Amino acid sequence: MDAWERNGVDYDVFGSSFYQFWQGNSSKNALAGLQKIENLAKSRGKMYAVMETSWLNSLKDADGTSNVIGEGHANAKVYSDDPQGQVDALTDMYQTLLSNDNGLGAFYWEGAWSPVKAGWTNWKYNKDMSDR
């Protein structure tokens, strides 16, 4: 950011990804990191937004391929691996994000954590599910 300022790069909002799962095995560690990034943006006079975030809803292998995150992974116990865990993770993130006067909000991402059937032939299944 120092180089951007030296070279006159202007931007409206400072944004970053925030995946609590990859921030350590404690929600406090993850949220402290989020607060530091937000404070960095504030020190530069910028608003801050989380550009992508999510939390898993299951550790089960739903598509027959190996998961990056699975049973026994220590960080998976920060929040529960179910829809309530998603609610809890997002609630904590938003409370931290909006506790500072420069937090704007977040974009939810990572559809791979929503189990679907794998493969190129699943278009009909996906279409049928989206029509419900």
Q: What are the language-model segments listed below?
A:
Residues M1-K28, R44-S58, N67-I69:
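Aromatic- and acid-rich polysaccharide-binding/catalytic face
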Residues A32, K36-N39, S58-D92, T96, ...:
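Aromatic-rich peripheral "rim/lid" segments of glycoside hydrolase catalytic domains that contact
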